[in-house]
């Protein structure tokens, strides 16, 4: 733990040195974005690319992790901006909500009997071995979707990273409820839920904290671009 904290302090010191090195007419330094596995990151990547056209000396670093890890890193200053999937507590943060929604569904093996269905309903999953996300707020959202079938949920594993989740499905552990990622093994398939369940994403940064000129300028760029497409 002490080694981890020491490394965090070193990373923060490096970011401060980069931030102080910028000139008045040229933004410099590194903007660190924390993100889980989400298709929404591709949209943020386009914002980063358009920002760099005007500010070519700014670099971006993407730090992958689950929501709790990203929030911790925002708190300790090693991540500037986070992409968090809802539902999530954002009371400590300034934020902008992205318009793009991601659909929930079930990842299963292609030899599963349910693979022949176009959509998956709560009754289809009653009594089936299921793989859930670890985050309690997300699990509550899924359990609400089950409605009257909630008592028949059979959770056999929990996982947060899509690659590891797919490995569990491929190995025959169970069916995984997750967001569509378009990244599957050839012998797996994704079936959307019915009724439909969608998840939004927010871009967050710490309230009442001074950020570097580069981060501040990028936040303004994000807001301006989102206003143009609203």
Residue positions per predicted region:
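Flexible hinge/capping segments at coil-to-helix
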Residues: 24-25, 93-104, 108-130, 213-216
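Short, well-ordered beta-strand segments
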Residues: 30-34, 82, 107, 131, ...
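Beta-alpha-beta core module
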Residues: 90-97, 101-103, 163-210
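Secondary-structure junction motif
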Residues: 128-150, 211-219, 229
